[in-house]
Amino acid sequence: MIINNVKLVLENEVVSGSLEVQNGEIRAFAESQSRLPEAMDGEGGWLLPGLIELHTDNLDKFFTPRPKVDWPAHSAMSSHDALMVASGITTVLDAVAIGDVRDGGDRLENLEKMINAIEETQKRGVNRAEHRLHLRCELPHHTTLPLFEKLVQREPVTLVSLMDHSPGQRQFANREKYREYYQGKYSLTDAQMQQYEEEQLALAARWSQPNRESIAALCRARKIALASHDDATHAHVAESHQLGSVIAEFPTTFEAAEASRKHGMNVLMGAPNIVRGGSHSGNVAASELAQLGLLDILSSDYYPASLLDAAFRVADDQSNRFTLPQAVKLVTKNPAQALNLQDRGVIGEGKRADLVLAHRKDNHIHIDHVWRQGKRVF
């Protein structure tokens, strides 16, 4: 397959030319047009590496499309997979939560079904994107460590993050923001919210630290990439570094982001944060970190289509120094390197032919086609 007449987004530059794919890999690319009649006309669009998503909880929405509504696993997985490739994502780490911030939540009920669906569809080769597992460990929960010890042995596990959403710290250092979020999410009265908050504080005091240390030790032993989550202080970051974290997910302050970078951790922020112009929790904005050169990876988090959109917005933003190739690395090369996936994330000879062809119309990025290992999947 030859793709002609495209703007190739390479590691350090954008060049007009063509690209050849053979046996699922990029065979060659050139700053010239192919004269072969079978070459596909890219119509001057951008040709980028396939996007790599490290943290999406999008799968949850398809298994439970409405409260108390369970959807068949095969259909849910297929719909989620289709949305991933339609967003330009060719490698996706499906983030599933171990432990829940509230007993009786849908997360724990769906956990085994979601993991089984990911494993089975990958083995059968029916997925359009490549799906792997990101285990999000909610530390203040008594079931978290036993579940993790069971699930960490599953083949697709590629990344583990350590989360603590208890009130008064990290993402919810502002207790009013915490109450506003969870009271609205669970439709609690003021009295119920007060009880819930007290229960979460007690659980955190009992379980967070021992679970954090035990899970990190298991990740180091198995050489599984570890991510911190919502670090807010120098002390948080120092502990995350000591535990072996290679990614700092959603640091909530400038201080935490800067300290993470100094410790050699990749700073990951939400693409929706870029698109919306700030954090929904009132924490440090991803655009501010981009201005300071402290942004390494973007994740679509809860909105898959935000990933490519955010990369172009970063490149357009005159307040930072990101070129388009540098901005595209936030969603391609950098996440690949953080997970040691050396076969993808860049347009280069011998690399996987995971590719996205997109056009820009009225300041919006439209995805035309997506290929994974040379096979068109969108």
Swiss-Prot record:
GO biological process terms, alphabetically, are:
organic phosphonate catabolic process
Reaction equations catalysed: alpha-D-ribose 1-methylphosphonate 5-triphosphate + H2O = alpha-D-ribose 1-methylphosphonate 5-phosphate + diphosphate + H(+)
Record keywords, A-Z: Hydrolase
GO molecular-function term, one example from the UniProt record: hydrolase activity, acting on carbon-nitrogen (but not peptide) bonds
Function, in words: Catalyzes the hydrolysis of alpha-D-ribose 1-methylphosphonate triphosphate (RPnTP) to form alpha-D-ribose 1-methylphosphonate phosphate (PRPn) and diphosphate.
- Any remaining note in the record? The sequence shown is that of strain K12.
The UniProt similarity line reads: Belongs to the metallo-dependent hydrolases superfamily.
One Pfam annotation reads: Amidohydro_3
Name of the protein: Alpha-D-ribose 1-methylphosphonate 5-triphosphate diphosphatase
Documented EC number(s): 3.6.1.63
